[in-house]
C-alpha cells in the first residue's frame, strides 16, 4: 500500500523533498567557501531535479515529462563554434557533423547554437544601425544650428531701413505731381546724371560765348519752353512771336537783359546759382519760376520734357505746355536739316545772321554789333 501524508503527498516524496532541501543548503554553504563555484548551473540542476520529484509525486512515474538539461558549453567548444561562425553563418549538414565530432556535442545542439548565434548577430547589427542613425541626426541638427547662426547676422543687417528713403521723401515736391517719383528707381540716377551733365556743359560753351559777344545779343527763345534749339533755321518762324507774351512776364525780363553782352554774363552767373540751388533742393535739373533760365545761351540738351512732370507750380506748367505746343513743330522740322548742335560747320556769320533775324522777329531794330 502507498502511504499518503499531508495534502495527498506520499511519505516517500516528503522524504525526498527534505533530502533535496538539505542538499541545496549544503550547496549554498559550499558556494560561500568556494569562490570558483558557479551557482547558476548547479541551481538549475537542483531546480530540475526538484521539479522532477514533484511531478513524480503528483502524477506518478508513468506520466513524468521528459526534460532535457541545459547544455553547458566549454571554452574550447565555444571557440570552435565561433571560428566556424566567422567563416559562415549557415553551415551545411556535413560541416555541422564534423563540428559536432570535434566538439563532442550532438549535431542538434550545434544547429541550435548557430540559430541562436545568428539571432544575436542580427540584434547587434540593428543596435549598431540605430546608433549610426542617431549620430547622423545629431550631426544634422548641429549643422543646421551652425548654419542658422551664420545666416542670422545678414538678416539683422538688412533690418534697419535705408536713410535714402527718408531723404527722398523729404525732397519730393509739395504740390500734386503728374508723375510718380521712385527714389530707388533708375530715374533718380538719370536725373542726377543729367544735372551733372548740365553743370559740366557750363564750361563747354565758353568759346561760343565769345563768338556770341562779337555777334551781338544771343538767340533769345522762350525761356519757359521745355525743348529748344538755338541753331535751328526755323527759329525766325512768325509763329514764335504770339507765344512769347504767354510766359507770364518772363520774356519781358529776358528782353531787358538782351540789350548788351554784359547782361549775358549776369544771366550766366544767375543761371549757375539757380542750378546749384535747384540741385540741392530737388534731385532733377527742373525749371523754377524765381529766375529765368539761361539755357538758350548754353546750347545744352534739346529735349528737356522729362523733368516737367515734377514742376512744383501748376500754372507755370500750363504755360510751359502752351509754349511746347508752339515750339514742337518747327523744332522737329528743323532738327532733320542740322547734323548736330556742337558741329564745327557753324560760323560767326551764320550766328550773326540768325541773331539779326531773331532780333527782327522780336521787334528790336537797333542791335550793337
Swiss-Prot record:
GO terms for biological process: midbrain development; regulation of cell cycle; regulation of mitotic cell cycle; regulation of neural retina development; regulation of neurogenesis; regulation of transcription by RNA polymerase II; retina development in camera-type eye. GO terms for molecular function: DNA-binding transcription factor activity, RNA polymerase II-specific; RNA polymerase II transcription regulatory region sequence-specific DNA binding. This is Diencephalon/mesencephalon homeobox protein 1-B. In embryos, expressed in mesencephalon with strongest expression ventrally. In adult, expressed in midbrain. Transmembrane segments: none annotated. Residues 181-191, 244-253 have a biased composition (Polar residues). The gene is dmbx1b. A motif (OAR) lies at residues 346-359. Residues 222-233 have a biased composition (Low complexity). One of its GO terms (cellular component) is nucleus. Residues 194-203 have a biased composition (Acidic residues). Residues 124-253 are annotated as: Disordered. Belongs to the paired homeobox family. The keyword Nucleus applies. Residues 66-125 bind DNA. SUPFAM superfamilies: Homeodomain-like (SSF46689).
